[in-house]
């Protein structure tokens, strides 16, 4: 039996995935988590074999959660699930150790296939994302300015885009407000911007966030 943990900040998504997988032979959803932080606690408590990890969540987010999770539980297989097909997320999640990558447009059969393959020690990348990664490999240079940012800088940039205040970011990441502001100015400098509004527009333009949200 493959033990699965579902991680997503939207209750409707978590419930939907859990219900879809409930009738699949050989799979058991052992729990749900609504944030990256909670996924770390649930993984320790429930000992899943596979984690379906939403990429864009408040707090530490799926990228940082994957990195932390695999550092403490290297045998767990993480399948990233996101609405975003554009870099830098697919590349960064795979570099962080994710064994699979799905879009939220994936059907039940594809999701089950991904879970079973990564559990068996293989990788699974959805066709759309695989195609995008192949095309990118032939490009002489990156088209996304966000590739210049570190994982921590991307994490903080997305929290800023999500309208989270400096003190909230500070509390969630266990950093001082001064350090958060230092990251913020460094992000602005690397992206050649000067405001949170410009950061948000740039993030939308390069597929870092869903423009409809």
Swiss-Prot record:
The keyword DNA-binding applies. Phosphorylated by GacS. Gene3D superfamilies: 3.40.50.2300. Induction: Increases 2-fold from exponential to stationary phase (at protein level). Keywords: Activator, DNA-binding, Phosphoprotein, Transcription, Transcription regulation, Two-component regulatory system. GO terms for molecular function: DNA binding. It comes from the Bacteria. Residues 166-185 bind DNA. SMART domains: HTH_LUXR (SM00421), REC (SM00448). Disruption phenotype: No longer produces the secondary metabolites diacetylphloroglucinol (Phl) or pyoluteorin (2 antifungals) or HCN. No longer protects tobacco plants from attack by the black root rot-causing fungus Thielaviopsis basicola. 50-fold decrease in expression of hcnA. Greatly decreased expression of genes controlled by this two-component system such as aprA, hcnA, phlA and pltA. Loss of expression of small RNAs (sRNA) RsmX, RsmY and RsmZ. Loss of the autoinducing signal (which is unrelated to N-acylhomoserine lactones and induces the Gac/Csr cascade). GO terms for biological process: phosphorelay signal transduction system; regulation of DNA-templated transcription. The keyword rRNA processing does not apply. InterPro entries: CheY-like_superfamily, Sig_transdc_resp-reg_C-effctor, Sig_transdc_resp-reg_receiver, Tscrpt_reg_LuxR_C, WalR-like. Residues 3-119 form the Response regulatory domain. The modification 4-aspartylphosphate is found at residue 54. Residues 142-207 form the HTH luxR-type domain. Member of the two-component regulatory system GacA/GacS which controls the expression of secondary metabolites and extracellular products. Acts (probably primarily) by activating expression of CsrA1 and CsrA2 antagonist small RNAs (sRNA) RsmX, RsmY and RsmZ which bind to and prevent translation repression by CsrA1 and CsrA2. Involved in the regulation of secondary metabolism and in the synthesis of the antifungal factors cyanide, 2,4-diacetylphloroglucinol and pyoluteorin. Involved in synthesis of the autoinducing signal (unrelated to N-acylhomoserine lactones, induces the Gac/Csr cascade). This is Response regulator GacA. The gene is gacA.
């Amino acid at each position: 039996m493959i033990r699965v943990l579902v991680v997503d900040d939207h209750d409707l998504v978590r419930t939907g995935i859990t219900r879809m997988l409930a009738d699949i032979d050989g799979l058991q959803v052992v729990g749900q988590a609504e944030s990256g932080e909670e996924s770390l606690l649930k993984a320790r408590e429930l000992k899943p074999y596979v984690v379906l990890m939403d990429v864009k969540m408040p707090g530490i987010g799926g990228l940082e959660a994957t990195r932390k999770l695999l550092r403490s539980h290297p045998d767990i297989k993480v399948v990233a699930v996101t609405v975003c097909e554009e870099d830098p997320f697919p590349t960064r999640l795979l570099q962080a150790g994710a064994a699979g990558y799905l879009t939220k447009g994936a059907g039940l059969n594809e999701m089950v296939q991904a879970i079973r393959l990564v559990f068996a020690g293989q990788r699974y990348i959805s066709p759309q994302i695989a195609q995008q990664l192949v095309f990118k490999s032939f490009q002489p240079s990156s088209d996304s300015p966000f590739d210049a940012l570190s994982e921590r800088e991307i994490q903080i940039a997305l929290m800023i885009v999500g309208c989270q205040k400096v003190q909230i970011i500070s509390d969630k990441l266990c950093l001082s407000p001064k350090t958060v502001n230092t990251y913020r100015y460094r992000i602005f400098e690397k992206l050649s911007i000067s405001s949170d509004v410009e950061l948000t527009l740039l993030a939308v333009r390069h597929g870092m966030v869903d423009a409809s949200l």
